[in-house]
Amino acid sequence: MILVDWQLRDRIARGHIRIDPFDPALVQPNSIDIRLGNHFVWYAPGKQVIDPYDKTTVTSGVEGKHADFFDLLPGQFVLAETLECISLPDNIVATIEGKSSIARLGVTLHQTGGWIDAGFRGSITLEMANVNARPVRVYAGMPIGQLVFYTTERAENPYDKKADAKYLDQRQATLSKYHENRK
């Protein structure tokens, strides 16, 4: 079941869902708007192949900065953080979706990583890209996407209890940690 506005406010008030900082004005009928943080990470252009199993190739050629805005160039891919840190209990999951007004500028918010497991804690790393023919400026603090929350049965092994929870408690845009998986 998708949680609606009053259910979201109630679960936040009772501490079942934690969002920090929380702005009640961002609660929508079926979601909560999230804002763009100020940490951006991207790969410099190059010919070196990124091998997901090789940490060296995943972490080399990376540039990043903290900024009040970022000009996303046509075809550019950048990792960014959400301003909000969230914490989910073991019976609520979330998905992240882009805002339609941002999508109409050609900016995608996530490539495939839109699922947030029960038990997740931390900021959310956004996988942004610009498919527009022109650069698009995005600002730290602007509403950039929305979280949709779903109730589930209690997870037997929620994300915060997994020994291999690679992105638990992340607090900035985080590169892939796929290399920590077994080949």
From Swiss-Prot:
It is an enzyme of class 3 (hydrolase). Its EC number is 3.5.4.30. GO terms for biological process: dUMP biosynthetic process; dUTP biosynthetic process. Keywords: Hydrolase, Nucleotide metabolism, Nucleotide-binding. The active site is at 127 (proton donor/acceptor). One of its GO terms (molecular function) is nucleotide binding. It catalyses: dCTP + 2 H2O = dUMP + NH4(+) + diphosphate. Pathway: Pyrimidine metabolism; dUMP biosynthesis; dUMP from dCTP: step 1/1. DCTP binds at residues 99-104, 117, 125-127, 146, 159, 166, 170. InterPro entries: dCTP_deaminase, dUTPase-like_sf, dUTPase_trimeric. The record marks 114-115 as: Important for bifunctional activity. It holds the Pfam family DCD. Homotrimer. NCBIfam families: dCTP_deam. Bifunctional enzyme that catalyzes both the deamination of dCTP to dUTP and the hydrolysis of dUTP to dUMP without releasing the toxic dUTP intermediate. Belongs to the dCTP deaminase family. This is dCTP deaminase, dUMP-forming. It comes from Methanoregula boonei (strain DSM 21154 / JCM 14090 / 6A8).
